[in-house]
Amino acid sequence: EQGQFYTILGPSGSGKTTLLSIIAGLDKQESGKIYYEGDDLDKIGLYKYRRNKIGIVFQQYNLISYLTGLENIELAMTETDNAIPKNQKEVAYALLEKFGIVKSKADRLVTKLSGGEQQRVAIARAIASNVDLIFADEPTGNLDTATEQEIIKIFRMLTEEFGKTVIVVTHSNVVSELSDHRVVLNEGQLKDIQ
């Protein structure tokens, strides 16, 4: 459902990251089909799906280290077929500021930012190309409790203000309690949806 915040929970080895990788089009399922808006992903084409429909936030941020936060966002804006405004720099600054990265920090190399700041840049990069879905794999796993709370607020903002659907793999009860829906896995099997 569009504009909702989902968490995927389960013990280590239960298949959470594998499920996320499959629905994000990064891995191929062994059987069955994955549908996006009623269309089979195999027929849509994974390249088009990944380029225009989804953004991914990894636990390790995966930012381009020799670029600034701003440049990481601008690059993401060019890597899509979706409509991006002509004033990319201003939009990128505004997006970063919305997520708590002031202009002076946006102009720093991402390696000079704290872990929480890098994660904010990674989230901004994920939505910069005007996608519908945001997938995140343990996005708060390396962060302290206060920063984890700030990242959760950003995910809520993505759903409430931007209308994005957010799907997060997590071990954190704090993250799962603040999501709209919880999907529980165990040993590769769906055990519960709340």
Regions found by a protein language model. Give the residues of each.
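Conserved ABC transporter NBD signature motif
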Residues: 32-40
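Catalytic Walker B motif of ABC-type/P-loop ATPase nucleotide-binding domains
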Residues: 134-137
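Conserved ABC ATPase "signature" region
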Residues: 86-104
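Helix-to-loop junction immediately C-terminal to a conserved catalytic motif
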Residues: 24
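Conserved catalytic motifs of ABC-family nucleotide-binding domains
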Residues: 130
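Conserved ABC ATPase signature
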Residues: 109-113, 117
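ABC ATPase NBD coupling module
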Residues: 41-55
